[in-house]
């Protein structure tokens, strides 16, 4: 993703876990340039409230591109009266049709506490099969760990924190400085 345009930039692991009537979204704080950590406390998980409809979003890829997408998502949510899936599909349509948006290099995980979706860099909207999804440089590590931890009785936040710790131990572009947001319907 962002690595295509800026070969040396790396960073971000975002994980979402749905369990027990809530969704927890966790993101690490590391941004790296090559072998150098530029920032260890970046905040890549945000709470949005367009029109009073609460949504939590985590992003990976280009930060400027992600903020552009988050702004557009907020507008789509207002227009869709808070219907997250509809707003995301409309955003994806724009992403695919608009010349400017097609060049954006970011991915999003979004949830309203019930619906959990990934919006890919290609403009696809995906719903995870196993109540767990992840994006970013350490996403596969976090996803594998979280799927294994879902076999336990741990609450969603603990699954997310433990899985992110495992990802941070494996992925050099992921740290243990987490931002965690919880949302339920």
Swiss-Prot record:
Entry's Gene Ontology molecular function annotations: metal ion binding; threonine-type endopeptidase activity
Matches recorded under InterPro entries: ATP-dep_Prtase_HsIV_su, Ntn_hydrolases_N, Proteasome_sua/b, Proteasome_suB-type
Primary enzyme class: hydrolase
Keyword presence, GTP-binding: no
Family: Belongs to the peptidase T1B family. HslV subfamily.
Assembly notes: A double ring-shaped homohexamer of HslV is capped on each side by a ring-shaped HslU homohexamer. The assembly of the HslU/HslV complex is dependent on binding of ATP.
Protein name per UniProt: ATP-dependent protease subunit HslV
Gene: hslV
């Amino acid at each position: 993703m962002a690595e295509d345009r800026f070969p040396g930039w790396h960073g971000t692991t975002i994980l979402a876990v749905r369990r027990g009537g809530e969704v927890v979204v966790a993101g690490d704080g590391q941004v790296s340039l090559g072998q150098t950590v530029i920032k260890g406390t970046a905040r890549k998980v945000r709470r949005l409230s367009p029109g009073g409809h609460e949504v939590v979003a985590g992003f990976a890829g280009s930060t400027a591109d992600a903020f552009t997408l988050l702004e557009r998502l907020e507008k789509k949510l207002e227009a869709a009266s808070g219907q997250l899936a509809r707003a995301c599909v409309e955003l994806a349509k724009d992403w695919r049709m608009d010349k400017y948006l097609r060049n954006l290099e970011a991915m999003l995980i979004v949830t309203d506490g019930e619906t959990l979706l990934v919006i890919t860099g290609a403009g696809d909207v995906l719903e995870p099969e196993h109540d767990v999804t992840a994006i970013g440089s350490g996403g596969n590590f976090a996803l594998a760990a979280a799927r294994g931890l879902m076999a336990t009785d741990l609450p969603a936040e603990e699954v997310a924190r433990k899985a992110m710790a495992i990802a941070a131990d494996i992925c050099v572009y992921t740290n243990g400085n987490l931002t965690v947001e919880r949302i339920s319907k």
